[in-house]
Amino acid sequence: LKSEMAKSEAPTLFQVNGPVGLANWKDYCMDLSGSELYSHLTSDDFVLKDGNAVQGIAYVIETYGIIYNKTILNDYCTMDNAVISSVDEINNFATLKAVADDIQSRLDEINDKFGYDLQGAFTSAGMDGSSDWRFKTHLANLPIYYEYKDKGITSTDAIEGTYLDNYKQIWDLYITDSTCDPALLSGKTGEDAASEFALGEAVFYQNGTWAYNDIKDNEVADEDLGMLPIYIGAEGEENQGLCTGSENYWCVNKNADPADIQATLDFMEWVVTSDTGRDALANTMGFVTPFKTFEDGYQSQNPLVLANDEYTKAGKTPVSWNFTTMPSEEWKNGVGSALLEYAQGTGDWDAVVTAFVDGWKTEYDAAHAE
């Protein structure tokens, strides 16, 4: 984007990923508060503001959690000495761990009884570049979310790491009750995890609504797909919903030619009001959007999206996407490296804490140095 913005014909429409991205580009962003696009939003929760100026508008809302195979889990529930009799009983970390531990210890028994080819309770927690973001960013959101919630804040220059013991116990569960030896995680990919789940080799798979396209048309039918919140053992998590937010905000370059700006505003309006545009976003791309114009028949039929709707209707509190406040990509990489070293047995958890807490302060200060 830096090189594009430096050109004589710089883009009129661009996107940022959240508050940190906006901080780098806010001097280019037109105030969209008077736009038709803004008037179609269902809530101000889906904008990025600088003061009262609306500088970014989210165009896709995504959700992630622990995707699960309903059929396998329901079959497990019928077994003698199963630790639950219904999936609905999984509403905290202790129960999730008890179920995963039991499934992991009874893989052969489950496979023999039901004809499955289960290799583990959870898919591999691959830490190569195609998969590590699930843990250094999306999973790391949970301890940040609960710390922010306790303090009543939405960002910080210095994270304390209050919930890093919780982060450790969910990470331990992922790498222990798994299809894969932890020593092999550095070479495991996002495609490996998607394939393991899609072929019925694992019951649980941390990912989001976007993963539907990787799963569908395989062994797992749409009606077999469910999603659980990522429980980490925080107080009150029985009322927790899925992690919902956006990393995709449209911004309009206020320095562009006025005719280009108007054409861009007209285009965005067309995307969210025309049949062609709405069909492309809702059906071809499978997006959930934050616009009122999609409420008349342009809602995604992605079963993972529908799972989120069920939590919302049940009054569960969605977990906000606070990872957009992570200080830098370097910070994420530091946490990811420490997680991998810990999983492989070549590093300890203290190194994860150091990367998380000290690394945050270092990277935040570097980004905000005058």
Task: Specify the residue positions occupied by each region the protein language model found.
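Extracytoplasmic/periplasmic substrate-recognition and gating elements
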Residues: N52, N218-G286
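A local structural motif
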Residues: D80-V87, D157-I159, Y174-K188, E201, ...
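Short helix-initiation/N-cap motifs at beta->coil->alpha
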Residues: I90-T95, L184-L199
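Conserved C-terminal helix/tail region of periplasmic/extracytoplasmic solute-binding proteins
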Residues: D275-D279, T289, T293-Q299, T312-E370
